[in-house]
C-alpha cells in the first residue's frame, strides 16, 4: 500500500490571518507543516550606465522603493556613492506583480531595517512604487532592458543574467 503525499513550497510561512493554513489543509487534506528547506538570498539589481558599483544604505533603499527618492542623482545616493557618475534621470523601480515569497522577504527586510521609512508590513504583494513584472525571470529581463532601473530579485536570477547587483546593503 502506498500513501499519496501532497506537498508545496513557499519562501514565506503561511499567514493565519489570511486563512492560508486552513486553505492548505483543505487542499491537501492534512495539516500543513512548516519545514525550512532552503535559503534564497535576495539581490538588489540595477541598470545605470557608467555605474559599476553602487552602495545603498537601507534607509536610502527604502526611500527608493517607496517612491520618496525619484532620481539617481538624489543627494542621499550621491553621498553614499561620491565617486559614481550618477545621471539626473528618473529611477525606474520594478517589483514582482505576482504574489511572491521574494517580495514578502524583501518587504520584511525593509520594514525591520528601516521601519520609520518603510512603514508597510511585509506582504507577498507589493505596496511600494514602480512597475510590475512577472516572476523572477521577468524582473531580471525588465532591469536588463530598462536603463536607470532598479529592483529586487532572487540571487540566482541576478547572477545567471549577469545583472549589476548592489551587493553592499548597509543597515
For each feature predicted by the language model, list its residue ranges.
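Short amphipathic alpha-helical patches
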Residues: 20-25, 84-92, 129-133, 166
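N-terminal segment of the mature folded domain
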Residues: 1-78, 86, 140-144, 150-161
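Short mixed-charge
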Residues: 73-85, 116-126
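Short beta-strand->loop
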Residues: 64, 72-76, 80, 88-99, ...
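Ligand-binding pocket segment of bilobal, Venus flytrap-like solute-binding proteins
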Residues: 1-6, 99-171
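Second-shell loop/turn segments in exported
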Residues: 31-32, 46-52, 90-96, 126-130
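Structural signal for conserved beta-strand scaffold positions within catalytic alpha/beta enzyme cores
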Residues: 36, 95, 167-168
Amino acid at each position: 500500500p502506498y500513501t499519496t503525499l501532497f506537498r508545496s513550497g513557499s519562501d514565506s510561512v503561511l499567514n493565519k490571518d489570511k486563512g492560508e493554513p486552513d486553505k492548505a489543509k483543505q487542499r491537501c487534506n492534512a495539516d500543513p507543516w512548516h519545514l525550512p528547506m532552503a535559503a534564497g538570498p535576495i539581490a538588489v539589481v540595477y541598470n545605470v550606465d557608467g555605474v559599476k558599483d553602487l552602495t545603498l544604505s537601507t534607509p536610502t533603499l527604502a526611500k527608493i522603493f517607496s517612491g520618496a527618492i525619484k532620481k539617481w542623482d538624489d543627494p542621499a545616493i550621491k553621498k553614499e556613492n561620491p565617486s559614481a557618475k550618477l545621471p539626473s534621470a528618473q529611477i525606474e523601480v520594478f517589483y514582482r506583480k505576482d504574489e511572491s515569497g521574494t517580495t514578502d522577504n524583501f518587504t520584511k527586510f525593509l520594514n525591520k531595517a528601516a521601519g520609520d521609512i518603510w512603514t508597510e508590513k511585509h506582504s507577498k504583494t507589493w505596496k511600494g512604487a514602480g512597475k510590475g513584472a512577472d516572476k523572477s525571470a521577468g524582473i531580471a529581463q525588465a532591469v536588463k532592458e530598462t536603463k536607470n532601473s532598479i529592483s529586487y530579485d532572487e540571487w540566482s536570477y541576478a547572477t545567471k543574467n549577469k545583472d549589476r547587483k548592489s551587493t553592499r546593503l548597509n543597515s
